[in-house]
Amino acid sequence: YGAVSAAQMRTLAKIATDFDRGYAHFTTRQNLQYNWIPLARAADVMDALAAVDMHGIQTSGNCIRNITSDAYAGVAPDEIVDPRPYCEILRQWSTLHPEFAFLPRKFKIAVSGAKEDRAAIGWHDIGLQLPI
């Protein structure tokens, strides 16, 4: 459901060039994964992310993963409720919540607001179907 500004995308590309091997991997849940950042440079990467209002908090490991929705959220003709604001509220609530930092396993949430469930909510740990 998320959007990345041009400045944020340029920063992500610069991180790949300056701190990794020139590329990054988009995960299934739309995280960007760098595999070769030297530990000694990790703080520099966090500073670069913070400069464009991004962070690395709970982006991997046993925590709540990116909250997903319909790929057509906001423009789907059968959409009754736009799920993106609900995803953002859940993200803000869970990101810094200490109870979600060390879950026994990665935890996945999806939100759908359309008649057709393109978010596959039944395959997630929590799948929310907004009223239609």
Question: Where do the protein language model's features map onto the residues?
Answer:
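Small-residue-enriched alpha-helical segments and adjacent helix-cap loops
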Residues: 1-132
